[in-house]
Amino acid sequence: MLENINGEIGISDSSVKVIPWDGYGNDQIVRQLIHQEKPDAILHFTDPRYWTWLYRMEKEIRTKIPIIFYTIWDDLPYPMYNRDYYRSDDLLLCISKQTKNLVENVLKDYPKEDWQVQYVPHGIDDKVFYPVANDLEFEVFKEKFFEGKEYDFVVFWNNRNIRRKN
């Protein structure tokens, strides 16, 4: 998997891990992961009110690595109660143009640099992920993707709401 990710984005040293956890974590596990794994950043998504424990330690974290929030907010009124969370993030990745507009308005009194609030479309590249035409095409894809290795268990997550978000 790492070779595929590295090749796709043109780097040679990515590290991808999924660490199962019940709930949204806690300060001890984040400290442990920062110490052991030495990540380049923390990326989180979902309502920031689920992450109050993370934001309580944001100064401690941000002395070592940045906090990145992949955020969504679809509708008015402006979520002013999220302002302090947004201010505590080093980078806000907005799932839609509407989200970007809302975030920028919430931060009007505390504007961030242009690069710190970015529109990152929600979805997948339909030139890479598309319905396969036949079984042979699927077998060729599997051979190439898995590099000839056999796996007992493979997960593919597909989300279909891209058109609604952009």
Question: Where do the PLM segments sit?
Answer:
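Carbohydrate-associated surface elements
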Residues: 98, 123
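Conserved donor-binding/catalytic core segment of Leloir-type glycosyltransferases
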Residues: 148-165
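N-terminal strand-loop element at the rim of the active site
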Residues: 1-28, 32, 117
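Short hydrophobic "strand-cap" motifs at the C-terminus of beta-strands
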Residues: 70, 95, 120, 157-159
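An aromatic- and histidine-rich active-site surface loop
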Residues: 42-61, 76-84
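A conserved, positively charged/aromatic
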Residues: 62, 69, 79-94
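A short helix/loop element that forms part of the nucleotide-sugar donor recognition site in Leloir-type
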Residues: 130-148
